[in-house]
């Protein structure tokens, strides 16, 4: 529900653990990229003039380059992180070594530490959450599926439709980020009233 999403976003933005893990969770919520795409993100993949993240095919499940538009909120998270890890290869380095990405279980552990059980939220759940809410909000299914980097379900459609829907996805992701901010603000008010 939107209320649960608001509580989740409030918990993420107030997470007292590592800056890298908090930032990774924020980017995951804002872009709904897969855990490995986030963990192994490299600074060279980001174009801050075009506000786009170009994930190379070899890092994608479908083995196809993926363009991820970056909202103002995602850019703000990345700017904060750039002061911390900008000189490294990885955007989200391990606290043990700057030359490797953070651990595979770090996001899961952080979500548990914030009080969310396995049946409530897991890292992959950000993708389902975004898809569900964006569909309920009336966004075009093709835009959502392209943002999720899913292969089209109809084989013929997949062969012929190679559209990126970049300007539409850019608008959708900015609206999504604003929507999440609104849900988080509402959750913060509820916490303040308790």
Annotate each predicted stretch with a short phrase.
Residues 31, 36, 40-83, 151-158:
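Conserved tyrosine-mediated DNA breakage-rejoining catalytic core shared by Y-recombinases
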Residues 41, 110, 147:
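Residues in the recognition helix of alpha-helical DNA-binding motifs
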Residues 1-41, 49, 60-64, 84-85, ...:
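Basic, Lys/Arg- and aromatic-enriched nucleic-acid-binding interface segment
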Residues 61, 72-76, 80-88, 93-99, ...:
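C-terminal secondary-structure termini that scaffold catalytic or DNA-interacting sites
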Residues 26-37, 125-151:
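C-terminal catalytic core of tyrosine-transesterase DNA break-rejoin enzymes
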Residues 12-16, 57-67, 93-99, 117-125, ...:
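Short, contiguous acidic/charged loop-to-helix segments that flank catalytic cores in large enzymes
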Residues 1-6, 50, 69-119, 129, ...:
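Active-site/catalytic core of tyrosine-dependent DNA strand-transfer enzymes
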Residues 45-52, 118-120, 137-161, 182-188:
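Short, polar N-cap/turn motifs at the start of nucleic acid-interacting alpha helices
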């Amino acid at each position: 529900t939107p209320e649960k999403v608001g509580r989740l976003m409030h918990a993420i933005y107030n997470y007292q653990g590592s800056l890298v893990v908090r930032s990774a969770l924020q980017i995951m919520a804002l872009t709904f990229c897969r855990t490995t795409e986030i963990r192994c993100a490299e600074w060279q993949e980001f174009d801050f003039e075009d506000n786009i993240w170009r994930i190379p095919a070899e890092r994608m499940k479908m083995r196809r380059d993926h363009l991820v538009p970056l909202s103002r909120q995602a850019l703000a998270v990345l700017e904060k992180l750039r002061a911390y890890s900008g000189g490294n290869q990885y955007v989200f380095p391990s606290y043990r070594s700057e030359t490797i990405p953070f651990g595979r279980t770090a996001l899961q552990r952080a979500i548990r530490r914030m009080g969310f059980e396995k049946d409530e939220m897991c890292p992959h759940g950000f993708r389902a959450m975004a898809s569900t809410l964006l569909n309920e909000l009336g966004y075009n299914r093709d835009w959502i599926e392209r943002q999720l980097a899913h292969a089209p379900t109809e084989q013929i459609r997949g062969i012929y439709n190679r559209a990126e829907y970049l300007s539409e996805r850019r608008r959708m992701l900015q609206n999504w980020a604003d929507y999440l901010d609104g849900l988080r603000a509402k959750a913060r008010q509820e916490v303040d009233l308790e």
